[in-house]
């Protein structure tokens, strides 16, 4: 079936073969291309729904979209569905696929659809979100559902799929509404690709940062504190602190000035910025002395006020402010996920105020910063430019100038990039930095944004060489995105085996007996003076148990100290990363760890 056409491509729009006949549009073949997988997975979501309806006749369905690497469907059933039920649902799906059922499409008006599904409250919910006009329905056998498509023309194309997990999901992501059942799955065009993906999924489960965060005692969450509010334990706080200190030095070397703005600002400031009108639903507000205040979801307004605190000349530009800014954003509880999606997080945020002629130069410098940092952590990455969304501030000309500046910088660096039409923030176009981890998964992290809008709204000025007042350009920039998300990604990328220079505990020191503890603590103190954290395992336990405990913590290095080491002032080193054991003098060991720490270059 590799050469069979399953859909067509009209510019960026995928159109299924049920909708188009005798076309000159680009053909989408049955394979593992991005467009083909979107059609296959969308169709497989309906195949799963058809199987569920067959097994659970009372089932009612909400939405079943394609997501990164797969699909899901939210639905309501009377009985509880668990992981053990996925096998029988898969079995029914295979039966339906083997039956080679034709998939057809027809259209009715919205009013006709409301009447057709009058006894289905979930379908009524879906129809409320659909604009007036024609509504498309896809039918396969006795099963039919509202859908924009596209779908494959026959269930025979849906052979290589896997249901991966079952979960609860609040209706429309609102925790105040009922909990529906959600089943996730994936699908491919061939058996080998599915097998490869499932292998990655199994490895991802072992690397899950929520699991490793607990095992390595990095962070925790507590219902009494609230969802999406991470609590950093000692190990996690040390890891984060090392990352923060390293980035602080890098920023200073690149000419950034540290600043700090308040976390609570009057609503008036958010009205000027446009956040109040365009981002209010994502913010938290309170009343103080009968005035409305908003907790900041972004750091830009504080940095603007720092810019306005002094008279600025063209000789001062570019001005580069950076802050580890704590921000809060309202997220529905249904989308919270470990450190990846939280309500409070800290951005490695910077804002650069410059002249229009300096935009490309500054973006190029940021791109070099990104490249150095990603190489340090062994991440590959790609760039994507997001353009003007439907809901935006500023006229088209301003957006065009800003978007062009980003493209020119990327072109000059020779970097390939994609275009996300309409994916920009409401106040300007942006470059999204997407990193690829050890499991070949892509993650959205940092951003670079050009902003002509906020300088205009806040009436920012500088005096040019002709002594005339001009408006600066503002560049928003975060490279990691947030410490929380990046640490979550890094944890999974390296499976909890952090690089030596940021490992929360870089060295485990194991004295064999009580007589060796004093020497162990002497080494610990010397390491701490080098900003290297270590732990002495001094409990009255067997040597093998102490080593096993240290190994479970995935420490880069373990030192074993006995009579011989104390007498010779040496160490027995187990290097987890180099996978070797050797004896070194203490001086040689200290020299080794100094070299490890000096490997971080910028």
From Swiss-Prot:
Enzyme Commission number? 6.1.1.3
The residues that hold Zn(2+) are 300, 351, 476
Disulfide links within the chain: none
The record's free-text note on cofactor binding = Binds 1 zinc ion per subunit.
* Region described as Catalytic: spans on this chain: 208-499
- InterPro entries, per the entry: aa-tRNA-synt_IIb, aa-tRNA-synth_II, aa-tRNA-synth_II/BPL/LPL, Anticodon-bd, Anticodon-bd_dom_sf, Thr-tRNA-ligase_IIa, Thr/Ala-tRNA-synth_IIc_edit, ThrRS_anticodon
The reaction(s) catalysed by this protein are: tRNA(Thr) + L-threonine + ATP = L-threonyl-tRNA(Thr) + AMP + diphosphate + H(+)
**PROSITE patterns registered for this protein in UniProt:** AA_TRNA_LIGASE_II
Taxonomically, which superkingdom?
A: Bacteria
The UniProt entry's GO CC annotations, sorted and at most eight, read: cytosol
Sorted UniProt keywords: Aminoacyl-tRNA synthetase, ATP-binding, Cytoplasm, Ligase, Metal-binding, Nucleotide-binding, Protein biosynthesis, RNA-binding, tRNA-binding, Zinc
Identify which top EC class this enzyme belongs to: ligase
Question: Which GO BP terms apply?
Answer: threonyl-tRNA aminoacylation
Principal location class? cytoplasm
| Compartments where found | Cytoplasm
For molecular function, the Gene Ontology terms on record are: ATP binding; metal ion binding; threonine-tRNA ligase activity; tRNA binding
Look up the record and name the cofactor or cofactors this protein needs. Zn(2+)
Role = Catalyzes the attachment of threonine to tRNA(Thr) in a two-step reaction: L-threonine is first activated by ATP to form Thr-AMP and then transferred to the acceptor end of tRNA(Thr). Also edits incorrectly charged L-seryl-tRNA(Thr).
Q: Which family does it belong to?
A: Belongs to the class-II aminoacyl-tRNA synthetase family.
UniProt subunit comment: Homodimer.
Check the record and name the PANTHER family matching this protein.
THREONINE--TRNA LIGASE, CHLOROPLASTIC_MITOCHONDRIAL 2 (PTHR11451:SF44), THREONINE-TRNA LIGASE (PTHR11451)
This chain belongs to the protein called: Threonine--tRNA ligase
> What species was this sequence derived from?
Campylobacter jejuni (strain RM1221)
């Amino acid at each position: 079936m590799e050469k069979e056409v399953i859909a067509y491509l009209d510019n960026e729009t995928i159109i299924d073969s049920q909708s188009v006949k005798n076309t000159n549009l680009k053909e989408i073949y049955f394979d593992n291309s991005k467009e083909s997988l979107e059609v296959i997975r969308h169709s497989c979501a309906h195949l799963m729904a058809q199987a569920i309806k067959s097994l659970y006749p009372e089932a009612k369905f909400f939405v079943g979209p394609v997501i990164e690497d797969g699909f899901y469907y939210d639905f309501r059933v009377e009985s509880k569905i668990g992981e053990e039920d996925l096998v029988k649902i898969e079995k029914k799906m295979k039966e339906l696929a083997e039956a080679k059922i034709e998939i057809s499409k027809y259209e009715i008006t919205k009013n006709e659809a409301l009447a057709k599904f009058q006894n289905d409250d979930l379908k009524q919910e879906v129809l409320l979100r659909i604009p007036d006009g024609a509504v498309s329905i896809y039918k396969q056998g006795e099963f039919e559902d509202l859908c924009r498509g596209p779908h494959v023309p026959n269930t025979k194309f849906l052979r290589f799929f896997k249901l991966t997990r079952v979960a609860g999901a609040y209706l429309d992501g609102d925790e105040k509404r009922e909990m529906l059942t959600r089943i996730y799955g994936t699908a491919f065009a061939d058996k080998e690709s599915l097998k490869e993906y499932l292998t990655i999924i199994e490895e991802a489960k072992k690397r899950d940062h929520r699991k490793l965060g607990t095992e390595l005692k990095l962070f925790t969450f507590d219902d009494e504190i609230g969802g999406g509010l991470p609590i950093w334990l000692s190990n996690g706080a040390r890891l984060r602190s090392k990352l923060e200190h390293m980035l602080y030095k890098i920023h200073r070397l690149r000419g950034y000035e540290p600043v700090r703005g308040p976390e609570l600002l009057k609503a008036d400031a958010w009205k000027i910025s446009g956040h109040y009108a365009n981002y209010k639903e994502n913010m938290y507000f309170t009343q103080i002395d009968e005035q409305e205040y908003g907790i900041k979801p972004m750091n830009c307004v504080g940095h603007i006020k720092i810019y306005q605190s002094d008279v600025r000349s063209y000789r001062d530009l570019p001005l580069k402010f950076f802050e580890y800014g704590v921000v809060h954003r309202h997220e529905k509880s249904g989308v919270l996920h470990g450190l990846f999606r939280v309500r409070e997080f800290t951005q490695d945020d910077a804002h650069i105020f410059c002249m229009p002629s300096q935009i490309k130069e500054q973006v190029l410098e940021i791109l070099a910063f990104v490249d150095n940092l990603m190489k340090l952590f062994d991440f590959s990455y790609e760039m994507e430019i997001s353009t003007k969304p439907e809901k935006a501030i500023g006229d088209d000309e301003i957006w065009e100038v800003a978007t062009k500046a980003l493209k020119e910088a990327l072109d000059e660096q020779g970097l390939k990039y994609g275009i996300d039409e309409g994916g920009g923030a409401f106040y300007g176009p942006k470059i999204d930095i997407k990193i690829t981890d050890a499991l070949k998964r892509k993650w959205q992290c940092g951003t670079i944004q050009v902003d002509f809008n906020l300088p205009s709204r806040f009436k920012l000025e500088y005096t040019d060489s002709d002594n005339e007042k001009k408006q600066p350009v503002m560049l928003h920039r975060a490279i990691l995105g947030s410490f929380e998300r990046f640490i979550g990604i890094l944890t999974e990328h390296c499976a909890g085996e952090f690089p030596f220079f940021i490992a929360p505990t870089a060295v485990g020191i194991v004295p064999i007996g009580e007589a060796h503890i004093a020497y162990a603590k002497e080494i610990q103190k010397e390491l701490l003076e080098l900003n290297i954290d270590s732990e002495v395992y001094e409990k009255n336990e067997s040597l093998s148990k102490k080593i096993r405990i240290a190994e479970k913590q995935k420490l880069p290095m373990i030192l074993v100290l006995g009579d011989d080491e104390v007498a010779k002032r040496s160490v027995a080193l187990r290097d987890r990363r180099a996978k070797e054991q050797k004896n070194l003098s203490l001086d040689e060991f200290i020299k080794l760890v100094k070299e490890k720490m000096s490997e971080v270059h910028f």
